[in-house]
Amino acid sequence: MSLGQENVDPVEVSGSHACLYELLCSETPKWTPLRVEDLQTSSSDPRDRLEKLLKQPGNKYCADCGSPEPKWVSLSLGVFICIKCSGVHRSLGVHISKVLSVKLDEWTDDQVDMLVGYGGNTAVNERFEACNIDQSKKPKPDSTNEERNDFIRKKYEQHQFMDPKDGALCTYQQPSRTNTSPPSLCSASHRSTKNRIGHAFRNSWGRRESDHKGPKKSNSMAGMVEFVGLIKVNVVKGTNLAVRDVMTSDPYVILALGQQSVKTRVIKNNLNPVWNETLMLSIPEPMPPLKVLVYDKDTFSTDDFMGEAEIDIQPLVSAAKAYETSSIKEPMQLGSWVASKENTLVSDGIILLEDGKVKQDISLRLQNVERGVLEIQLECLPLTQ
């Protein structure tokens, strides 16, 4: 990638992409924005293109703390980040930062195109840290989680380091000429509106959850949390779920672990939905239960509650730590969560070591609702992945 603008052909941009390009190229920048065509190779594998993007100089280090070899991406912000910073990004909520793994998640060409369109860590930091004069306060690889949380929230959620005039740069959006242009990074007002909508969504279901489980922890505690691993949750399917519309429901699932929450897509008109959708969460210490909530999506009113359950992930995490470096090749049972009248299990949740992975299949009877069963699969991953 060129470090200057000499002998660089003009880049034709349009739509929301134009705003970001104008911002990044203004006032004689010291770098040239990446172009989608620069990363298009004869290979059609998105992962190959992603690996090539990761080798760009600015992307070799975490955008927030500078740790080398970041293995995580905030797709919605366009930055490569380390495992420690990824936990804070997840706590921001997917309406601000949607975190994916370079290695563990399946990538599409559209997602890589979107990432390329942001310009990489250098380009994004030029914008989000435009007024971050005191670089000494930026986290280092060995900074505490409290320091990371404070900086990352100020940077992406509160926009404290952005140029004040940045929000006025994109009052006009050029018409898009293609359907693959990445979302604009230029509209602070749009981002703020999106944040308010996201907060309203989280608060709406959070209040309903508090009716059953008590108040949530404040965000001020998020930075004091240490992360001990990752939990990969495959929401498989629901069976005989409750009716919340005339004769059916439009269900979706929310997973919450500490300050983090993620949700599946909505499946319309189905009491036996099959999601088969994989979601990822960081595991905090101390380790809270994994909360599972099911809702019916409504267009003109508050989403209806369809049941909930809690999962103790401590046995799975303990088993994963014990066998993290195991060379055992044959499938092996490591433990089980026994179904009883005291818990919500339909059948025993067996913890298995298979192909070097520690997994647990769980069938849950939803609580505080008239009926419904949810099947999920858990996998515990070490922080090194």
UniProtKB/Swiss-Prot annotation:
Cofactor: Ca(2+)
Source taxon at top rank: Eukaryota
Start-end of C4-type zinc fingers: 62-85
Function, in words: GTPase-activating protein (GAP) for ADP ribosylation factor (ARF).
Gene3D superfamilies for this protein: Arf GTPase activating protein (1.10.220.150), C2 domain (2.60.40.150)
PANTHER family membership: ADP-RIBOSYLATION FACTOR GTPASE-ACTIVATING PROTEIN AGD11-RELATED (PTHR46220:SF2), ADP-RIBOSYLATION FACTOR GTPASE-ACTIVATING PROTEIN AGD12 (PTHR46220)
Binding site residues for Ca(2+): D298, S301, D304
Domain Arf-GAP: 47-169
Taxonomic lineage from the root: Eukaryota, Viridiplantae, Streptophyta, Embryophyta, Tracheophyta
Signal peptide: none
TM regions (residue ranges): none
Protein name (database record): Probable ADP-ribosylation factor GTPase-activating protein AGD11
GO MF annotation, one: phospholipid binding
Residue ranges occupied by any C2 domain in the UniProt entry: 212-326
Pfam families in UniProt: ArfGap (PF01412), C2 (PF00168)
Keywords: Calcium, GTPase activation, Metal-binding, Zinc, Zinc-finger
Cysteine disulfide links: none
Annotated segments matching region Disordered: 197-218
